Design a protein with these regions (language model features):
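Active-site neighborhood of glycoside hydrolase catalytic domains
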Residues: 208-229, 233-335
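Aromatic/acidic polysaccharide-binding cleft in carbohydrate-active enzymes
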Residues: 323-398, 416
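Solvent-exposed loop/turn segments at secondary-structure junctions
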Residues: 75-78, 113-116, 166-170, 234-239, ...
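Carbohydrate-binding surface patches
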Residues: 405, 416-452, 459, 463
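Conserved, mostly hydrophobic/aromatic
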Residues: 70, 103, 160, 230, ...
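N-terminal catalytic cores of secreted or lumenal carbohydrate-active enzymes
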Residues: 35-227, 258
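Loop/turn elements at helix/coil->beta-strand transitions in domains of secreted/extracellular proteins
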Residues: 66-68, 100-107, 155-159, 223-229, ...
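Bacterial Sec-dependent N-terminal signal peptides
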Residues: 1-23
Length: 472
């Protein structure tokens, strides 16, 4: 009889549902307190009587996240040189380390000068060198390449993609790196190019430029850096005084289909070609290229920035199979403010809701007010004071960390709905649900968040970023 009782008791324990309290991990940031671990929140069973501000649907997966990153620029490397070796390593670790930093895994770099180079240069400034006899990355070997290798200490599998701001000036109609005059360049008014194509649309020049870009990829490979993708023109619609180049949609379609694509294939480069980085929101311009079978044979995806945010959702709906990437975060004006961080959250949510698989910040590190070589003060994730050597992690650093730290490459964005809109949800490879929120209000806000058959209630602080982590 006693033995029968024990068997019955064991059977009861095996069939009885397990009851335990599951908690939600909570990290928050305000302007006064950054990256603070709050007390865990209890996850409760959902009821029909409870109203919910947001509902998360873990089984409804959207795009897979390829990663997060920023851009390697010359002035960023110069800012790091202000620090001693130990402090410099700490900064790099806080950007790239997967356990302690932002876990950057997919980053950008320029091909030749951009507006955060020390000054103008290209990789072949010898006029008429169609065979690229004088092509050289010697300057990069002193600045950008060491910068990248230092980062790879903390992220060995770091993926790099690249884009030119301007071709060599001898390939351009006005023989200048810029298309618009300004107080920081020597372009004459009569040489401005304010519409049309700034690149010479001649077969010799187009062929040479395709070789120029392919040699860039090959040269970097020899220095131990694999460039997995090239976006062949930064902002082909921009008008400004720093390095740039105007292209019309038909000209872009032509160079991709007849020159870049065939050249990369002939050289057996595994590097992808992307249509980017696009700063335009007119669908007809996209259609010219994305509806071309000849160009689409070579295009791996579309990169968007600035005005691109206005069309990304429409573009994603129309071209559902085309991969999308956000390629440059909006840069501010060197204020390094909490408001800038809130704008960053807005941009990240906007692009992620539009289907991008990667998000790229602009300057990772800058000195002082973040002044470019062409006179524009801009923000960075990390600010270094040259005089005091003080390192400041800006509000945008923490806004970015609320996304990237718990959402590594391989995570999936998942569906969410409800009246509370300042929210993005992911499922990471560790089986964790990650919910990132922003409270823009000047007062605290209570939120009920439902996850399948459970929910939790939380009151988030005014002007705060919050990340909630639930083990599923």
């Amino acid at each position: 009889m006693k033995r029968q009782f024990k068997i019955c008791a064991l059977y009861f324990l095996l069939i009885r549902p397990a009851t335990f309290t599951q908690n939600v991990r909570w990290i928050r940031s305000t302007e006064q307190e950054r990256w603070v671990s709050n007390n865990p929140i209890e996850l409760k069973n959902a009821t029909a009587a409870t109203s919910y501000d947001a509902e998360i649907y873990p089984t409804q997966k959207q795009q897979t996240i390829d990663g997060w990153g920023g851009c390697f620029n010359e002035l960023g490397w110069d800012a790091l040189q202000v620090l001693d070796a130990k402090d410099r390593e700490t900064v790099l670790k806080t950007l790239f380390d997967p356990k302690e930093g932002l876990n950057f895994t997919i980053c950008r770099m320029p091909i030749g000068a951009n507006d955060y180079a020390r000054n103008w240069y290209s990789l072949d400034d010898s006029a008429g060198d169609f065979k690229m006899k004088y092509f050289s990355i010697d300057r990069d070997r002193k600045i950008l390449i060491p910068y990248i290798h230092e980062a790879k200490k903390y992220q060995p599998a770091l993926k790099l993609w690249a884009s030119p701001w301007s071709p060599p000036v001898w390939m351009k109609t006005n023989k200048h790196y810029a298309n618009k005059r300004g107080d920081h360049n020597d372009l004459k008014p009569e040489n401005e190019v304010l519409s049309g194509n700034q690149f010479i649309q001649d077969e010799n020049y187009l062929s040479a430029y395709a070789v120029y870009l392919s040699k860039f990829v090959e040269a970097y490979q020899k220095d131990g850096i694999n460039v997995y993708a090239v976006h062949f023109q930064n902002e082909p619609y921009t008008l400004n005084q720093w390095p740039n180049c105007l292209w019309t949609p038909s000209a872009m379609c032509n160079i991709i289909a007849r020159y870049l694509g065939p050249t990369f294939r002939k050289e057996q480069l595994k590097t992808e070609l992307w249509l980017g980085t696009w700063n335009n929101d007119v669908m007809a311009n996209f259609d010219t290229i994305l509806s071309s079978p000849e160009a689409m044979k070579y295009i791996a995806g579309v990169g968007l920035q600035w005005e691109g945010k206005n069309i990304i959702q429409e573009l994603h709906k129309k071209y559902t199979t085309v991969k999308l990437m956000q390629t440059e975060s909006e840069c501010g004006n060197g204020d390094f403010s909490w408001k800038d961080a809130e704008h960053l959250f807005f941009l990240m949510k906007k692009y992620l809701d539009g289907g991008v698989t990667a998000y790229t910040y602009w300057n990772m590190v800058l000195a002082d007010k973040g002044t470019s070589s062409w006179g524009w003060n801009q923000n960075a994730l990390i600010q270094i004071d040259k005089a005091s050597r003080k390192v400041t992690y800006t509000p945008e650093y923490y806004a970015f960390k609320h996304f990237s730290y718990f959402v590594p490459a391989g995570s999936s964005k998942i569906e969410s709905a409800g009246s509370f809109k300042e929210l993005v949800a992911f499922l990471n490879p560790h089986g964790e649900l990650v919910i990132v929120t922003n409270n823009l209000q000047d007062t605290a806000k209570a939120i009920n968040i439902k996850i399948s058959a459970q929910y939790f209630t939380v009151t988030v602080q005014p002007k705060s970023f919050n990340t909630f982590i639930v083990k599923l």
